[in-house]
């Protein structure tokens, strides 16, 4: 019985571009709704909690990836540990994440373009963006990864420029006003807001595990993935 494998074409830079590119959209949109739910200070606590969770998750995920370099990701790991049923459950959960995340990002792209070009239908722009990215992936993972690397570098530069522009006007005293879910005092509403804001804090890290799932297409995954 022959085993079909994917061609390893991705280097460390490609994997870095995939990892950062998958999550950097969360720095542009999505997370800011957490301020409305938890307040600035409450959302800061939420973000630190989620960051700790994702740090543990990624270290564990990377270890699994280097041990089992399979494009199935969680499906392959769970199948090895819990059998076909466990693999199916993990695979379906991962599929749901990666099926629904791209349309959400495409809609955000459409909304951004609509701000710059009011006459442009954001839904049509979203469909166009989705088709472009889908075509790039069909053409080949190397082409798609190179394109994502270039776009990711540009996105990082834009964020740094934005932070440099707004930093002189930052006021910590304004930042902490009503910082606990609309109150200046930490209490039960603040705790509720902290937990309610978890989905928005996840936007900072959502889909970062996608880089590890490219292990089967990575050159020397035991070295390149941890570096990325």
Model-found features: residue ranges?
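Helix-boundary and loop/linker segments of multi-pass membrane transporters
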Residues: 5-10, 35-36, 78-82, 182-190, ...
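Select transmembrane alpha-helical segments in multipass membrane proteins
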Residues: 8-19, 83-96, 125-129, 187-201
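Short amphipathic alpha-helical coupling elements at transmembrane boundaries
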Residues: 66, 73-80, 115, 146-149, ...
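Acidic-residue sensor for enzyme active/binding pockets
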Residues: 27, 63, 97, 148, ...
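Hydrophobic transmembrane alpha-helices that form the core helical bundles
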Residues: 33-37, 45-46, 55-138, 143, ...
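Membrane-interface "cap" regions at the ends of multi-pass membrane proteins
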Residues: 1-44, 54-59, 68-71, 179-181
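Helix-loop-helix junctions that connect adjacent transmembrane segments
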Residues: 40-48, 120, 150-228
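Membrane-embedded alpha-helical core segments of multi-pass
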Residues: 24-28, 53, 57, 128-140, ...
């Amino acid at each position: 019985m022959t085993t079909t494998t994917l061609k390893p074409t991705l280097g460390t830079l490609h994997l870095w571009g995939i990892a950062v590119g998958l999550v950097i959209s969360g720095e542009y949109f999505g997370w800011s709704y957490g301020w409305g739910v938890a307040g600035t200070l409450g959302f800061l606590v939420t973000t630190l909690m989620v960051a700790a969770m994702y740090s543990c998750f990624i270290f564990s995920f990377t270890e699994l990836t280097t041990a089992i370099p399979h494009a199935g990701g969680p499906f392959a790991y769970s199948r090895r540990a819990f059998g076909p049923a466990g693999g199916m459950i993990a695979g379906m959960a991962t599929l749901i994440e990666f099926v629904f995340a791209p349309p959400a990002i495409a809609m955000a792209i459409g909304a951004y373009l609509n701000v710059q070009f009011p006459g442009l239908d954001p839904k049509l722009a979203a469909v166009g963006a989705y088709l472009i990215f889908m075509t790039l992936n069909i053409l080949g993972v190397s082409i798609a990864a190179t394109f994502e690397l270039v776009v990711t570098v540009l996105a990082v530069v834009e964020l740094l420029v934005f932070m440099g522009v707004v930093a002189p006007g930052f006021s910590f005293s304004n930042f902490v006003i009503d910082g606990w879910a609309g109150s200046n005092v930490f209490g039960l509403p603040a705790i509720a807001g902290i937990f309610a804001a978890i989905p928005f804090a996840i936007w900072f890290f959502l889909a970062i595990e996608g880089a590890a799932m490219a292990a089967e297409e990575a050159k020397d995954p035991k070295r390149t993935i941890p570096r990325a």
